[in-house]
Amino acid sequence: INTFESNKEFVLNTLDISRFMRLRKEIKKYNPDYLYIPMIHLWNPIVNFMAKGAKIITTIHDITQHKGEESFIMDSLRKIVLKQSDKIIILSESLREKLVYQKVKSENIFVIPHANFTYYGENFDIEKKDYNNKRILFFGRINAYKGLDVLLEAMKIVVKENTDIKLSIVGNGDIKPYEEQIRELGNNIESNVRWIKDEEVEGFFMQSDFVVVPYIEASQSGVIPLSYSFGLPVIASKIGGIPEQVIDRETGYLVEPNNVVDLAEMILGLGSSESKRKELGKNAYTFAKEKLSWEGSAKLFDKLVKSI
């Protein structure tokens, strides 16, 4: 049953009562013992109500809205879903305390880390990975909390010492707040600000040497396991659940959020050592394969279901 791909479709489909009648019919036909919600959706309260008798398991990606994404509706929706859920899955241990503060019992909270994205590069060979592209990558939705402005300020320091390094900005979002910084950096910046198709993802990572995740707030980041899946080390902010994903000096480096100078130094350091990029990149790839496998996630999920 299709939900929506735009705000217009959401309004139209939400007002389409027949769609919910079909949904109710399907739920009644399956008569599920468990209902799994992989992410918060505006239809969740309705679906949860329809699945009376089923144990509800919900994955919560963020406890509060990020900077620039504040929404009273989403905050209220999250509170409703938390009350309806029997078990909550979080992607990092850092969120547990915040959920407990919102009256969720700790024994009903389970951590299942964000798994890898090796399926984006099924033919990827870590032994053939080129770490001499002289290009670093900022990947994903462009939002205020992701710290792109901090990275661009750091790049102003970086290019004074290493004019060969380029930053690729790849992802969908509003680039206007950063246009002046980008102009100042000239040819050291490459931008692909648009929706990136699945089949394009591999190319951007393959032509990069490492990834920077300069978030100023975060619960965790899906970009990190994605980067590891292509053998790329990550320089990331030491915030939220990110230190659970980036093992400092093993799979990348951690820096304090909003610290332009430290971020620039880390970029210059990693950017000047191909051997270090290769070492950390191989560690990251191994970490993704061994610690962030979908098989491992499935076992943890199975254990959770059996605990209800």
Describe each model-derived feature in a short phrase.
Residues 19-23, 32-53:
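An aromatic- and histidine-rich active-site surface loop
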Residues 233-236, 246:
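Short hydrophobic beta-strand element within catalytic cores of glycosyltransferases
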Residues 248-249, 253-260, 269-274:
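Conserved acidic donor-binding segment of nucleotide-sugar-dependent glycosyltransferases
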Residues 179-202:
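Nucleotide-activated donor-binding/catalytic signature segment of Leloir-type glycosyltransferases, i.e.
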Residues 69, 100-101, 110-133, 308:
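Acidic anion/phosphate-binding donor-loop and adjacent secondary structure
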Residues 129-146, 152-155, 167-170:
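Conserved donor-binding/catalytic core segment of Leloir-type glycosyltransferases
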Residues 206-219, 232:
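Acidic donor-binding loop of glycosyltransferase active sites
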Residues 262, 269, 276-291, 297-303:
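A short, well-ordered alpha-helix in the C-terminal region of glycosyltransferases
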